[in-house]
Regions:
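Second-shell loop/turn segments in exported
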Residues: 27-33, 43-47, 83-91, 107-119, ...
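Alpha-helical segment that forms one wall of the substrate-binding/catalytic cleft
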Residues: 93-145, 149-156, 173
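Sec-dependent signal peptide recognition
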Residues: 3-10
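Short, surface-exposed glycine/acidic/tryptophan-bearing loops
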Residues: 71-103, 149
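Export/targeting segments at the very N-terminus of extracytoplasmic proteins
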Residues: 20-78, 134
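Hydrophobic h-region of N-terminal signal peptides that target proteins for export
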Residues: 13-20
Length: 174
């Protein structure tokens, strides 16, 4: 009986630890990695696999979700009051939309990857930066253009000069 209680308690502890809270200081990558050592290992693994700089991965997560694993875009309002549909299917640390996330899972053979898991999100960001480099010939070390391509998507990147909001966001990613 005592053994069963320990197993149940341990299981609950594991589940609760998976519900990661937002780091205290999201402005400093060293502080983030001191608080979340595994996050450093995950970003480093993504860097080794895809060549996406660690600072760029963190900048994308900061800008997209502010390190909130359950982040979603705000709902549109009907008559400025009634909550309505969300403008996109983006979710999690990377704010990846469902279609692109499914493409990532297929191409990387990661059927169990989830947008709410930091490890999978930074691997997705690394994959996206790598593909952006291959498709659009944007340097992996160019945060401005890489973020514009991430924000607008590969197809809409060519028209980014018309989107003032995208330009402002891209200037904030460093």
């Amino acid at each position: 009986m005592i053994h069963l209680k320990k197993i149940i308690l341990f299981t609950i502890l594991i589940i609760l630890s998976a519900c990661s809270s937002i780091p205290k200081n999201t402005q400093n990558s060293c502080a983030i990695f001191e608080e979340r050592y595994l996050w450093y290992k995950h970003t480093k693994a993504s860097y080794k696999k895809w060549g996406a700089p660690i600072h760029l991965q963190l900048a994308f997560v900061k800008k997209e979700s502010d390190f909130d694993w359950l982040a979603k875009p705000p709902r549109k309002k009907l008559f400025k009051v009634i909550p309505f549909k969300r403008p996109s299917s983006s979710f999690g640390y990377s704010q990846a939309v469902k279609g692109t996330w499914e493409q990532y899972k297929r191409e990387t053979n990661s059927p169990l990857a989830t947008r709410a898991r930091f490890k999978d999100s930074v691997d997705f960001i690394g994959w996206y930066i790598h593909k952006t480099n291959k498709i659009l010939k944007i340097s992996k070390k160019d945060p401005y253009k890489q973020y514009l391509a991430y924000y607008k998507g590969w197809g809409d990147y060519k028209n980014y000069s018309k989107d003032k909001k995208a330009i402002i966001y891209a200037k904030l990613v460093k």
